[in-house]
């Protein structure tokens, strides 16, 4: 029997975990030495590469000194917390990767806490020691303190630390003596991480993730915790509420390098993919057909936020996208539910709308961005935070927020957070930067990032994670400025935009097509302002030729999808099409808005 090590990678966004796995893959000669290291092998989804975040957990396996090492790459963002917990169930130890300059960040803490609670043994890798002014030794102390505060056992606190630079491709026990490759890390994995326990008996495999193939449908992935599985074997699927179904395994695959290899039998402790089992959910157990024993189901974080998805019914609908009907959107959301655990979907008030529940703005905006790239057109409402009633009291989700800013911007950062009902817990100087910790309601985080970056000239680093439900903190003032709303459908003309520059700032370029009811800018005052920017200049003979000035407009404010979701008000929607993002009023007609009581002023 081949020896196995199952290991999960934990790291903060952008601390280099995907690069490290790529290095391990080269070390095991699975890929010939690359011409361009920039292409991350694991983040194989466009959005992941663009944003530099891992969303879905991936599995890769390398063989070193005859031992098979299964590496499971976990997402670092607590918005994808549903992914993290399942993945840790497959691992026997964890590789904690920290940046030698930044140290431990809240996201790392989130995953590490889950891993320590499950009793996994850690190895700490201090990465990026090639960075100028890094502080590897201090970071190692920080990790120790963090583990103490997370109630780690003495055995877990006696962890091994390896220093190195994944980018340059070396690891070493001492950061002052670089080596030529990453073998010290692989040796440490073999020495420190326990092999999975071999348990004789009837098979038990808990489905911890799933893959989808257009040919064979849904594939169950999990770690075989007891017994062995064979191709063609009859098994039971133990679902929630003691439901048991009989199935036959059509095909078994284990992870081999970057792909999968078909096998006839899977030994205990290995991670495998099972084909031929229909209708399984994450957390179900594949067990013996005669006397099935189920493993306890996996708990997944509850959603903290909801958003309304509806069909695109703006005047420009169907111009960009391939999929525009409510049936297309429903089918796509149902498909997403199969693989995205922390997501829930309920029907909306009318047939064309759906309420989608998720873990945060990032979680939901990644879904919207994926749909947009696939050719969908849809409209999305303002994100709403979910309240709970606990002991008769209205409670709301509170997040643990940490902000790192240069010293001169500390005042601005504290003011922004406290204005949104944030409570400053402690601040600690780190060189010329300061780390601030707050407890803040989830609704206070909406739009905070963009304001914070503006206030700190782009220098702030912000991270947050869900902490607990606490009593409602009271109203938070949202954006104070009204919108500039178009009165006409047509083309935006530079001449009329120039005349309205003193009224606010624009979100669109001259020459863009706009429609009546579209939000084209931000008003300088509180109320909305209805404006006509489709007026052209009358070219009659009356005016003197010399008195014309060239129109110079300041560049428009361009927002990303997340910024738009955080910016819109209750009576506005974001229209998402493959090539455009627009903001609009729910009621396009100014007279309808007047009747409903939030009409705005007319220009």
Residues of each region from the PLM?
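Active-site phosphate-binding and catalytic loops of NTP-dependent enzymes
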Residues: 30-57, 80, 146-158, 190-203, ...
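Conserved nucleotide-binding/hydrolysis modules and their immediate coupling elements
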Residues: 204-307, 317-319, 481, 490-540, ...
């Amino acid at each position: 029997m081949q020896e196995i090590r199952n290991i999960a990678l934990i790291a903060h966004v952008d601390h280099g975990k995907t690069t490290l796995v790529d290095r391990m893959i080269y070390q095991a000669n699975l890929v010939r030495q690359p011409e361009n290291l920039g292409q991350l092998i694991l983040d194989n989804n466009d959005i992941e590469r663009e944003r530099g975040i891992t969303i879905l957990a991936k599995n890769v396996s390398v063989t070193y000194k005859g031992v098979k090492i299964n590496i499971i790459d976990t997402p670092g963002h607590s918005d994808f917390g549903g992914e993290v917990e399942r993945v840790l169930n497959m691992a026997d130890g964890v590789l904690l990767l920290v940046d030698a300059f930044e140290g431990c960040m809240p996201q790392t803490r989130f995953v590490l806490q889950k891993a320590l609670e499950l009793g996994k043994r850690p190895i700490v890798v201090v990465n990026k020691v090639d960075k100028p002014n890094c502080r590897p030794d201090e970071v190692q102390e920080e990790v120790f303190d963090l583990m103490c505060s997370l109630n780690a056992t003495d055995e877990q606190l006696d962890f091994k630390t390896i220093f190195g630079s994944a980018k340059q491709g070396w690891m070493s026990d001492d950061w002052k003596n670089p080596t030529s490759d990453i073998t010290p890390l692989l040796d440490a994995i073999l020495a420190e991480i326990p092999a999975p326990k071999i348990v004789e008996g009837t098979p038990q495999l808990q489905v911890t993730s799933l893959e989808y193939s257009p040919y064979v449908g849904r594939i169950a992935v999990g770690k075989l915790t007891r017994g062995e599985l064979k191709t063609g074997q009859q098994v039971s699927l133990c679902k929630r509420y003691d439901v048991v179904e009989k199935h036959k395994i059509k095909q078994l695959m284990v992870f081999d390098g970057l792909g999968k290899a078909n096998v006839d039998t899977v030994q205990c402790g290995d991670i495998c993919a099972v084909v031929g089992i229909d209708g399984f959910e994450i957390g179900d157990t594949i067990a013996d057909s005669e006397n099935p024993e189920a493993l306890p189901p996996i708990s997944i974080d509850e959603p903290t936020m909801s958003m309304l998805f509806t069909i695109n019914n703006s005047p420009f609908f169907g111009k960009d996208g391939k999929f525009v009907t409510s049936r297309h959107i429903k089918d796509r959301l149902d498909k997403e539910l199969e693989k995205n655990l922390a997501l829930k979907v309920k029907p909306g008030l009318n047939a064309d709308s759906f309420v989608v529940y998720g873990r945060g703005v990032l979680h939901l905006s990644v879904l919207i961005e994926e749909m947009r790239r696939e050719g969908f057109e849809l409209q999305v409402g303002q994100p709403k935070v979910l309240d709970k009633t606990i002991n008769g009291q209205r409670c709301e989700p509170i997040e643990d927020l940490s902000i790192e800013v240069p010293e001169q911007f500390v005042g601005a950062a504290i003011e922004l957070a406290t204005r949104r009902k944030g409570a400053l817990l402690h601040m600690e100087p780190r060189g010329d930067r300061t780390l601030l910790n707050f407890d803040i309601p989830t609704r206070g985080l909406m739009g905070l990032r963009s304001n914070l970056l503006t206030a700190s000239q782009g220098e702030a680093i912000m991270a947050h994670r869900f902490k607990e439900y606490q009593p409602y903190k009271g109203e938070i003032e949202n954006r104070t400025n009204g919108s500039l709303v178009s009165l006409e459908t047509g083309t935006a003309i530079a001449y009329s935009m120039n005349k309205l520059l003193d009224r606010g700032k624009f979100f669109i370029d001259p020459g863009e097509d706009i429609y009546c009811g579209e939000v084209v800018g931000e008003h300088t005052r509180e109320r909305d302002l209805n404006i006509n920017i489709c007026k052209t200049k009358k070219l009659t003979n009356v005016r003197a030729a010399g008195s014309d000035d060239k129109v110079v407009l300041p560049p428009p404010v361009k927002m990303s999808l997340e910024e738009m979701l955080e910016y819109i008000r209750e009576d506005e929607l974001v229209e998402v099409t493959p090539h455009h993002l627009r903001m609009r009023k729910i009621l396009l007609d100014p007279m309808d808005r007047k009747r409903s009581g939030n009409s705005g002023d007319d220009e």
